[in-house]
């Protein structure tokens, strides 16, 4: 996996960001000397290194591996992720990764760091190139893979960008389930179809996957991958608004997700061809290429990868200190590398076995028996879709209903529109056409801020979620609207975390001892300190049942 990812990453870097718009590359450009002073390798050709240099397509996953190894768990917490980023991920990061890291510097934790209100780059590519590893740690267990990858994905992504990252995680998790007796073309199509089942039909990511796969299957010429790339350019970039979409820029999730799928499908399991196509598709061309190179390495193994380069000796060494100088040196006697892919694989194996055991499987020496596959529909196993389906704000809005937001003492209703817009829990994956709201902020001079959301129907609520930030520290009291009366929700309720004035935004889950029928929720947020300012991103509830 790591070797395939590294070859594809550095080959793709020869073209990264060069063609951000038409005219794009074609097969005829392979071997072209671009004469670009700002590229380490400006000839479009396979790049082989010794040692392999770290880059953001491998080094954030590399840090995650270190954190999992150190904490002896593949299920990292918000605190573990943020601490690891602050210690090891400081430079060589861009777009959403940079935004998330800056928020962490202020004390914010995932998933807040990937929420659109605070991170306007949440629909960029970042999570797609930093989380595939979690799929490899859960072979044949896509539901477990999604659970492990959930917080790492939400660290930098939301909406359909989070779905694209999930899709890649699923490809890696499902690689072990491919029928090796089938032709490679059929194996790849099967993988894409299986991963697609976990993504909601409403998502832009689903639209892209369906569009690319359909065009590939309808194309009589497997070498004419440019046809599909150009169709992607037309639909999601050049005339995106004609199709109800928005093109962000060359580092966005969407066109680069499409490029990765084009390389995977038209490459038909051939490593060299897959990397060639990925490198020539355009936009941020190293990212999806690296993902698919790693996938084929995982799927077909080292011997097949080595056979693709019969005249080369493929290095096993990895120089992590190029971009991550605070990481451990596992090769103190090697002056130019700090790790090897072999050692990295050895650190992954215990995590794989732990994941299998925790999922109910069996580990007997070198034999792994995976747990029985979940009988549920794949989409229902997606933790992001589960969150969206249980969000009262989102489901009422999706059903065409109404929500009434009130902040005591606030006369400008436009300032409160983001409090119950559902953005922080909206994982339908639909294109967002409205401008992102700002967090509601208020200097609380009378001791407390009172915020309510009233529904147009009664809902069976089991949890109230407040995403809030306060300079001076807070105390929170919750109430529910029962009939015409607001009733306190105190007996037996548990708040998931304690207010911390050092954390700019926190997620508070107020868990009720049992579900309660409510037609509204209200919170009293008490703030203290020299500057008692309170910020509110979202006030939502999670429900049992269906609308």
Q: What is each PLM-predicted segment?
A:
Residues 70-125:
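Extracytoplasmic mature domains of secreted/periplasmic and thylakoid-lumen proteins
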């Amino acid at each position: 996996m790591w070797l395939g990812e590294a070859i594809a990453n550095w080959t793709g870097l020869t073209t990264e960001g060069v063609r951000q718009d038409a005219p794009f590359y074609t097969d005829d450009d392979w071997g072209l000397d671009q004469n670009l002073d700002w590229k380490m390798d400006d000839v479009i050709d396979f790049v082989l290194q010794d040692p392999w240099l770290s880059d953001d397509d491998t080094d954030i996953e590399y840090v995650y591996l270190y954190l999992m190894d150190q904490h002896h768990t593949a299920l990292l917490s918000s605190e573990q992720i943020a601490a690891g980023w602050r210690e090891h991920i400081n430079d060589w990061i861009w777009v959403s990764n940079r935004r998330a890291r800056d928020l962490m510097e202020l004390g914010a934790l995932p998933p807040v760091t990937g929420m659109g209100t605070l991170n306007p780059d949440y629909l960029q590519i970042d999570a797609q190139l930093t989380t595939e590893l979690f799929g490899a740690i859960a072979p044949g267990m896509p539901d477990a893979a999604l659970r492990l990858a959930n917080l790492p994905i939400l660290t930098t992504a939301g909406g359909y960008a989070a779905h694209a990252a999930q899709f890649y995680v699923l490809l890696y998790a499902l690689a072990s389930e491919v029928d090796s007796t089938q032709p490679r073309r059929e194996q790849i199509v099967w993988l894409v179809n299986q991963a697609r089942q976990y993504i909601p039909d409403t998502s832009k990511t689903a639209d892209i996957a369906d569009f690319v796969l359909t065009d590939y299957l309808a194309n009589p010429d497997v070498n004419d991958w440019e046809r599909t790339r150009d169709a992607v350019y037309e639909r999601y970039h050049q005339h995106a608004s004609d199709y109800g979409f928005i093109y962000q820029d060359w580092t966005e999730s969407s066109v680069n997700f499409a490029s990765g799928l084009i390389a995977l499908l038209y490459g038909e399991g051939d490593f060299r061809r897959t990397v060639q196509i990925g490198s020539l598709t355009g936009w941020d061309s190293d990212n999806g290429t690296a993902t698919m190179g790693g996938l084929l390495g995982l799927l077909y193994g080292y011997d097949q990868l080595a056979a693709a380069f019969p005249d080369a000796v493929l290095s096993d060494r990895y120089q992590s200190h190029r971009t991550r100088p605070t990481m451990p040196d596992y090769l103190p006697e090697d002056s130019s590398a700090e790790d090897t892919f072999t050692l990295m694989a050895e650190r992954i194996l215990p995590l794989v076995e732990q994941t299998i055991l925790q999922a109910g499987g069996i580990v007997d020496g070198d034999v792994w028996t995976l747990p029985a596959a979940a009988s549920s529909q794949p989409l229902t196993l997606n933790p992001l879709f589960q969150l969206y389906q249980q969000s009262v704000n989102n489901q009422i809005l999706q059903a065409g209903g109404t929500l009434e937001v009130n902040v005591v003492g606030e006369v400008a209703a436009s300032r409160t529109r983001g409090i119950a817009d559902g953005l922080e829990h909206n994982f339908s994956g639909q294109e967002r056409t409205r401008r992102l709201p700002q967090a509601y902020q208020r200097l609380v001079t009378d001791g407390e801020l009172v915020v309510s959301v009233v529904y147009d129907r009664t809902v069976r609520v089991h949890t109230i979620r407040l995403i809030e930030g306060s300079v001076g520290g807070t105390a929170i009291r919750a109430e529910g609207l029962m009939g015409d009366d607001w009733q306190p929700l105190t007996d037996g309720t548990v708040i998931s975390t304690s207010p911390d004035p050092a954390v700019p935004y926190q997620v508070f889950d107020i868990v009720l001892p049992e579900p309660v029928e409510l037609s509204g929720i209200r919170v009293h947020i008490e703030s203290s300190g020299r500057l008692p300012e309170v910020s509110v991103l979202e006030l939502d509830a999670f429900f049992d049942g269906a609308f």
